[in-house]
Amino acid sequence: MSGKPPAIFLMGPTAAGKTDLAIELTTVLPCELISVDSALVYRGMDIGSAKPSKEVLAAHPHRLIDILDPAQSYSAAQFRADALEAMAEITARGKIPLLVGGTMLYYKALIDGLADMPAADATVRAELEAQAEALGLAELHRQLAEVDPESAARIHPNDPQRLIRALEVYRVSGESMTAHRRRQFAESRGADAGAGGHLPYTVASLAIAPTDRHILHQRIALRFSQMLEQGFVDEVRSLRARSDLHAGLPSIRAVGYRQVWDYLDGKLTENEMRERGIIATRQLAKRQFTWLRGWPEVHWLDSLACDNLSRTLKYLGAISILS
């Protein structure tokens, strides 16, 4: 192993069983957990985010859960700063940071650093927002596909915040967001060619998912139905009652929350809300798989295997991450 301290990434699509395996690992390894999930950072968003229960969190604390109010935004840059601080504290106590979650952009921000993007431009942003209002998001997505096809392929056509930001970067700088990120990636590898790039840790990357995609789809549908039974609609209703929350916020645009919000707005029937929530979650899982297919040196585990703990320990021993 290199002179860097170890860290473990436990990644995977939604509903794959990441949290259960992470908790198992903490019982046999000197690990402390850091959540890597853009929805779990929000207080009061428990059911729809599949947040671990209060009992689980009390027994197995996770950093970066319940750190923000839903009215606030949280960026990859903020996550990187918070995660690095938590990792340093954990390492200083002789423990191993175990990062668990499915927000792949956050993992990438940790590994590669963040591209030096142009600052927001209020005039350009107002113009793009006016276009979105007048012409629709599909037109903005078409424009983005012309100047930055890679970002267009990655950004959902109904994600106004990311669409507008990608077009804003291009209009302000004359260079696509993809080009900015490629340059930053090259610089990070040049600055530190070791594992982790800008990240001062030796990272073991694990990913867990069912080998049969149909099984994952069944899990997603079952979990969404269970969320509804547990009071997901009432949870969103309480958020909707707040005057400072609206459908344009990143928290409310989270998968599931957006669909239930639309249902409470009368835009969807209950059946439509359920179906669209499941579809949106499946689409999220597909995007997570896309990220993971390009992830270097990732060790895959089958969610359905009964010996994932021993398989994980064997792998970590084989790459000497624990020595």
Curated annotation (Swiss-Prot):
Keyword Protease: no
Annotated stretches, region: Interaction with substrate tRNA: 37-40, 161-165
Gene Ontology process terms (BP): tRNA modification
A Pfam match: IPPT
Cofactors: Mg(2+)
Catalytic reaction equation(s): adenosine(37) in tRNA + dimethylallyl diphosphate = N(6)-dimethylallyladenosine(37) in tRNA + diphosphate
Superkingdom of origin organism: Bacteria
EC numbers on record: 2.5.1.75
Keyword Nucleotide-binding: yes
Positions bearing the site annotation: Interaction with substrate tRNA: T103, R125
Residues that hold substrate according to the record: T14, A15, A16, G17, K18, T19
Keywords: ATP-binding, Magnesium, Nucleotide-binding, Transferase, tRNA processing
Gene3D superfamilies, alphabetized: 1.10.20.140, P-loop containing nucleotide triphosphate hydrolases
Molecular function GO terms recorded: ATP binding; tRNA dimethylallyltransferase activity
Binding positions for ATP per the UniProt entry: G12, P13, T14, A15, A16, G17, K18, T19
HAMAP family: IPP_trans
Subunit record text: Monomer.
Described purpose of this protein according to its UniProt entry: Catalyzes the transfer of a dimethylallyl group onto the adenine at position 37 in tRNAs that read codons beginning with uridine, leading to the formation of N6-(dimethylallyl)adenosine (i(6)A).
Similarity comment: Belongs to the IPP transferase family.
Family matches, as NCBIfam families: miaA (TIGR00174)
PANTHER family associated with the record: TRNA DIMETHYLALLYLTRANSFERASE
Name of the protein in question: tRNA dimethylallyltransferase
Organism classification: Bacteria, Pseudomonadati, Pseudomonadota, Gammaproteobacteria, Pseudomonadales
